């Protein structure tokens, strides 16, 4: 994903559907980790939420240019409701995709700072390898100063032997459970005493895939390795992984709203206690409902509300619901209730 470019000329087709129109702006905002209530709602509707923060440095112009190209190729079709995958586009996907085309665990981009973790990982492997060969005079392949500082600080408390033993054992165990071809791709990029890591381009040439697919696959495996190490609490190198951990989907301010809401406070009480705008608190509750399938909707949606909303929207697909429909029928209801009902019904669809 160097330079924030996540696609060749067809990879974005993966995010579109033949039945459901989807807006490219939502995909772009999801990839760059925009977390407004509206973006997250449509991300939920489009099954995009696992891809939050997948490309934080996305080149927006290149993204837009690729969308235009896919439309020009007639692999996507545009309507007022969004973009849909065409039958031609589906054939392109089926023909071109390989085992390296898409990540297996995109959700891990939300759990770890990839740029920092990648630098730490590459340095750990190199330092461990040189230690095994009793070599203390070598050129450090990765120039990330923060990663260098963190590893030096860690080694002031822990031994080189611990580093070498733990990282070698973890790599062996982790790669043993991976697809062999992907494991080979991953190790080809590592730097050691007698091994100069290959570039994405060199690996791509060997495997006859695109450099992007090499980058994407390596990133996916690196993040999986971070999760693998963190799950083993006895490992000292887990401290280095933990440094790269991201705070998660819920910001501290949303967590504070959640705490008050779970204590039984009403929306009005939370607004008064937190001295925040109603729109802010209501957005917090939308984000909570999106991220928590067991959200207690009954605290906000009464039986009467549910009856009204069901009557108005029963015959319409969720993607086509309009808040204005309530007003047109002379029904006064806060937008929060309308949106929470849509979120509740969406989670219900996915659990059927």
Predicted regions span which residues?
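Short Lys/Arg-enriched helix C-cap and helix-to-coil transition segments
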Residues: 225-242, 292-307, 349-352
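Short alpha-helical "recognition helix" segments of helix-turn-helix
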Residues: 27, 202-205, 270-272, 322-328
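Basic amphipathic alpha-helical segments that dock to polyanions
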Residues: 62-77, 220-222, 288, 345
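Short, amphipathic alpha-helical interface elements at domain boundaries
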Residues: 2-58, 146-158
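A short, conserved structural fragment
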Residues: 68-81, 227-228, 294, 346-352
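Short, amphipathic alpha-helical "recognition" segments used to contact nucleic acids or chromatin
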Residues: 10-18, 183-197, 250-264, 306-317
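Accessory beta->alpha helical hairpin/"wing" motif in late/C-terminal subdomains of nucleic-acid enzymes
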Residues: 77-118
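Exposed, interaction-prone assembly regions rather than primary DNA-binding/catalytic cores
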Residues: 101-176
